[in-house]
Design a protein with these regions (language model features):
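Domain-level signature for proteins that mediate thiol-based redox and metal-cofactor handling
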Residues: 1-172
Length: 172
């Protein structure tokens, strides 16, 4: 039986790796600049290797155009903080899931005007399609205007109450 990890990874126990994690965790997603890669759950691991630091990330989807920018920003942030040479590895399995997004990240999305994905229930119960909550007025009376929003990981919705369009971060 294969199990897929559906939770965010904890910060490292090792003090040096934890400091490196803390620096890498400050890198923001260039497509959703209100979120860090830690908020998104994209930052997967940090470890020390003989040739430097290895940071692993899992993009929100395999063709994410932000991967190169995130990789460069991690290396730049670590270098600016005085850490030895770093390389970033992109890990595609297990695939990223919105379950890895932190509660803080979900709150930041909503305050930014993007409806966050609903958290998956641990007991396996499937959430009924009750509507996506409008981040502007809180109404559940919304409709999908386009399955594709400003980025591939978002859909465009319109609130029927306040008439405002908004992005919805798709569940994965």
């Amino acid at each position: 039986m294969v199990t897929v990890e559906r939770v965010a990874r904890p910060r490292p126990d090792n003090a040096i790796e934890r400091r490196i994690w803390d620096v890498a965790a400050t890198v923001v997603d260039p497509e959703v600049p209100v979120l860090t890669i830690e908020d998104l759950g994209v930052l997967r691991s940090v470890r020390l290797a003989d040739d430097g630091i290895v940071v692993q990330i899992t993009p929100t989807y395999s063709g994410c155009p932000a991967v190169d920018a995130i990789r460069d920003d991690i290396v730049t942030a670590l270098s600016a903080a005085g850490h030895r040479p770093a390389r970033v590895e992109v890990v595609l399995a297990p695939a990223w899931t919105t379950d890895w997004m932190s509660e803080s990240g979900r709150d930041k999305l909503e305050r930014y005007g993007i409806a966050p994905p609903a958290p998956r229930r641990a007991d396996g119960v499937i959430r009924l399609g009750l509507g996506v909550r409008c981040p502007n007025c809180g109404s559940l009376h919304t409709r999908e205007a386009s399955h594709f929003g400003s980025t591939s990981c978002k859909a465009l919705y319109v609130c029927q109450r306040c008439q405002e369009p908004f992005d919805y971060f798709k569940e994965h």
